[in-house]
Curated annotation (Swiss-Prot):
Its cofactor is Zn(2+). The gene is secA. Its EC number is 7.4.2.8. It is an enzyme of class 7 (translocase). This is Protein translocase subunit SecA. It comes from Rickettsia peacockii (strain Rustic).
Length: 906
């Protein structure tokens, strides 16, 4: 019934596209008039549009004319005219939706339409892509159109200085990678003045390869971190011990990606740990004193049994580097958390880096939800449409191709073993190579690509390998994959964003030329050669895409297929599978094995059966559903931190903007004074129960007040009067500082102390949340909802953090002093700014993890309570410890956290 209705009325997508086509006629009707404009008149249209917006017009009022102007500019500058389907894609993007357009349909050109239109507001547009190469390429090629129309263009890539980034972000249209945008947002919220920040307020983002960024990378948060405890030696020792375990000592679940010691395994590892003097004889791994070792053992087990080199990570230049499972690319600057990365470094016998503590983090899910208006484009989004709608409130519209797709998608071939599968692939590659048909062979990992490469080397078949190890050559290799007799092996979607043109890409070959010798003649020669090869390739059948395995996601398989048949070109695709493949083995092997036994599969023989295809699709849907739930669950937990992050970042901005910090100082002084007095002089208590001695100690610790006991000797004194006296004394101390140092210097000092203190307590809070998150799932065994428990405890920790902020701020303000011996009064402000600058620069060093007001201003700005090097602390003398973070291990050596030991009463 549903299929009949769809035939009669079309799908919702068909109806949307039909409606959009009716709007395209309005743009096309403007083309003759726009074509008659001179270059100068066309450029002046930008000024005209801005004036209309200034006078109250909306973007929708000028959308058709603006699109017509961009189309004409693209034709004059780049020789490219937007097709009607590209105009439809532009309207979809402008309206805050995702457009699904096949590979080769010119998505980069489509983005110029909404980017230009929305940039007219002057609030900036971000065009987001997945790597530096694409950001540079698109800003250079499409930037010509924007510049022609009088708009500025910026490009953001890794390693740029802040001044260059700031200028790029201030441009009308900025091309940037998703990673740099996220990290710049985090870095900006660690800066100490608004002038240092590089980003403008969020406005509109167009995300290229939107499925890759919003779905594939959603599970991996961006993290800025600093090193903590040096446990490298322990990781090394545990690694050696784990290598001695037998297969029966642990059990793993590949579906859930978990691993646990068995009873025999626990006994075995306890014996090994005891021999190495890591635990005491006759103690258990799970005794309280040894509990921290469980974490090291578990991570070493995971490193050796759940993670594979050249599949999950690779080792390059003595470093373990994570491979993105969806793209096959190295994830630069990313490290596994919770000690897993250190365990992998121990496994691979490279230098073990210190464990990191989170200083700032955000997921792409929460970063991109900051934009008031968000859109995206990709070749494959319909399979993930429900998730994109649910999480980002983004609708997906599939746009028809400009030319009819002539690509032929052949049925899968399934073999009993990997060897039989490779034999069949090799035979097909040999046949295609002999007739000159180019091939793109997709693998799911570096390991598999190198495995296949060695097979082709033995057969003496020339080929190129494209994987994370050769990232720099990625675009060039993939661009030439359509040449005559070309054989290219690629991991997943490596090279995504670069078209494969039949016969080859002449522009990239021309870029390789030496401009000094016969440049023009060589260009003509290359173009002639490419044209000839294109004819030969079309005669041979176009690009043949071979999939060596099904991916967990149907979308990734569709992306691989989409590399062939661009813009109506001929082509073929085919997947080769075996029962040894990961997807088949883990998720679908039993069902499919039964079918194959029934059908009587013989060695070297392929099978085609609709039941097998359905089983594979069900397996993929099962994994997609599992991954979706993981991303959704991550978002639920991250939303808790995100709400707190927004509050902290907003407060930080308010502090930086503030012209006067006295309000916060006075209110916090009064709040703490009341709290301290009531702690030692409870309401309704008898005078003899008052603890005046400890009240005096606490007032000196917090406010630097020397409290006179005689004040309390009066019979009629009350706690309210004591509180009032304390507040007056605190105000007097502050006033004295202000008179000594100047009100401007005190304001700057207070602002800076408040910012550094906020950074310190926020960092400690993130550390606490990390630990809370790690163990919260165990609450389910106690019939409690882990998410509800996490929300409740995270809120309590946040309140505690705010209380710590107030106390540390007050303590530092009332205790610090500035040495003015060598500073003239009128130069104090300048001197302080210089000191402040030095301090900030140390903050920006990612290796710097200890935020406290006294670190870099040791001679000029000295808080009484400073952090002491742990090596200089005497366990038996608490006065030698300095300030101890509540989450540090207590310096007394008890093994407990400070807040549960000597700091329990603080």
């Amino acid at each position: 019934m549903l299929s009949i209705l769809k035939k009669l009325f079309g799908t919702a997508n068909d109806r949307t596209v039909k409606k959009l086509f009716s709007e395209i006629t309005k743009i096309n009707s403007l083309e003759p008039a726009i074509q008659k404009l001179s270059d100068e008149e066309l450029k002046n249209k930008t000024v005209e549009f801005k004036e209309k917006l200034k006078n109250g017009a909306t973007l929708d009022d000028i959308v058709y004319e603006a699109f017509a102007v961009v189309r004409e500019a693209a034709k004059r500058v780049c020789g490219m005219r937007h097709f009607d389907v590209q105009l439809i894609g532009g309207l979809i993007l402008h309206r805050g939706m995702i457009t699904e357009m096949r590979t080769g349909e010119g998505k980069t050109l489509v983005a110029t339409l909404p980017a230009y239109l929305n940039a007219l507001t002057g609030k900036g547009v971000h065009v987001v892509t997945v790597n530096d190469y694409l950001a540079r390429r698109d800003s250079a090629s499409m930037g010509k159109i924007y510049n022609f129309l009088g708009l500025s263009v910026g490009c953001i890539v890794g390693g740029m200085p802040d001044e260059v980034k700031r200028a790029a972000y201030n441009a009308d249209i900025t091309h940037a990678t998703n990673n740099e945008l996220g990290f710049d947002y985090l870095r900006d919220n660690m800066k100490y003045s608004l002038q240092e920040r590089v980003l403008r307020p969020f406005n509109f983002a167009i995300i290229d390869e939107v499925d890759s960024i919003l779905i594939d990378e959603a599970r991996t948060p961006l993290v800025i971190s600093g090193p903590v405890n040096d446990n490298a030696e322990l990781y090394g020792k545990i690694d050696k011990i784990v290598r001695l375990l037998n297969a029966s000592d642990f059990e793993k679940d590949e579906k859930l990606k978990t691993i646990n010691l068995t009873e025999t395994g626990i006994t075995h590892i306890e014996s090994l740990l005891s021999k190495e003097n890591i635990i005491k004889p006759d103690t258990s791994l799970y005794d309280f004193e040894n509990l921290t070792l469980v974490h090291y053992v578990n991570q070493a087990l995971r490193a050796h049994n759940m993670f594979t080199v050249n599949v999950d990570y690779l080792v390059r230049e003595g470093k373990v580097m994570i491979i993105d499972e969806f793209t096959g690319r190295v994830m630069e600057g990313r490290r596994y958390s919770e000690g897993l990365h250190q365990a992998l470094e121990a496994k691979e016998n490279v230098k073990i880096q210190n464990e990191n503590q989170t200083l700032a983090s955000i997921t792409f899910q929460n970063y991109f939800r900051n934009y008031p208006k968000l859109s995206g484009m990709t070749g494959t989004a319909m399979t993930e449409a429900p998730e994109l709608k649910d999480i980002y409130n983004l609708d997906v519209v599939a746009v028809p191709t400009h030319n009819k797709v002539t690509r032929l998608d052949l049925d899968d071939e399934i073999y009993g073993s990997k060897k039989e599968k490779y034999d069949a692939i090799l035979k097909l590659i040999r046949d295609c190579y002999d007739r000159g048909q180019p091939m793109l062979v997709g693998t799911i990992s570096i390991e598999k690509s190198e495995e296949l490469s060695s097979v082709l080397n033995k057969e003496k078949i020339p080929h190129k390998v494209l994987n994370a190890k050769f990232h720099e050559q990625e675009a060039f290799i993939i661009a030439q994959a359509g040449r005559f007799k070309a054989v290219t092996i690629a991991t997943n979607m490596a090279g995504r964003g670069t078209d494969i043109m039949l016969g080859g890409n002449p522009e990239m070959l021309i870029e390789q030329l030496d401009k000094e010798h016969n440049y023009e003649a060589k260009i003509a020669e290359i173009k002639a050669q490419i044209a000839e090869e294109k004819k030969q390739v079309i005669e041979a059948g176009g690009l043949f895409v071979i999939g060596t395995e099904r991916h967990e996601s149907r979308r990734i398989d569709n992306q691989l297929r989409g590399r062939s048949g661009r813009q109506g070109d001929p082509g073929k695709t085919k997947f080769f599978l075996s029962l040894d493949d990961d997807l088949m083995r883990i998720f679908a092997s039993d069902r499919i094995s039964g079918v194959l036994r029934t059908l009587g599969l013989k060695d070297g023989e392929a099978i085609h059966h609709p039941m097998i295809s359905r089983s594979l699709e069900k397996a993929q849907q099962k994994v997609e559903g599992h991954n979706y739930e993981m991303r959704k669950n991550l978002l639920r937990f991250d939303d808790v931190m995100n709400d707190q992050r927004k509050i902290i970042y907003e407060q930080r901005t308010e502090i930086i903007k503030s012209k006067d910090s006295h309000g916060f100082l006075n209110s916090t002084t009064e709040e703490l004074a009341k709290k301290i007095v009531l702690t030692f002089m409870p309401v309704g208590s008898y005078r003899e129960d008052w603890d005046i001695e400890n009240l005096s100690v606490e007032l000196h610790r917090v406010f630097s007040i020397k409290f006179d006991h005689n004040v309390v000797s009066k019979n009629d004194v009350t706690e309210e009067e004591i509180t009032k006296t304390v507040i007056q004394m605190a105000h007097y101390i502050y006033k004295s500082k202000e008179e000594a140092y100047s009100s401007e210097l005190m304001h700057n000092a207070m602002k800076y102390i408040l910012l550094t203190t906020l950074d310190q307590v926020w960092k400690d809070h993130l550390y606490s949340l990390d630990h809370l998150r790690q163990g919260i799932s165990l609450r389910a065994y106690g019939q409690k909802d882990p998410l509800s428990e996490y929300k409740r405890e995270a809120f309590n920790l946040f309140e505690q953090m705010l209380n710590n902020l107030k106390e540390l701020f007050i303590q530092t303000v009332y205790h610090f002093h500035i040495d003015l011996k060598n500073v003239q009064k009128e130069d104090v402000s300048l001197e302080y700014k210089k000191l402040q600058k030095n301090m900030r620069e140390s903050r920006e060093d990612p290796a710097f993890s200890k935020y406290n007001a006294g670190s870099s201003l040791e001679t000029d700005l000295k808080p009484v309570v400073s952090r002491i090097d742990p090596k200089d602390r005497n366990p038996d003398d608490p006065t030698s410890w300095g300030r101890v973070s509540r989450n540090e291990l207590c310096p007394c050596g008890s093994g407990k956290k400070y807040k549960y030991c000597h700091g329990a009463n603080e």
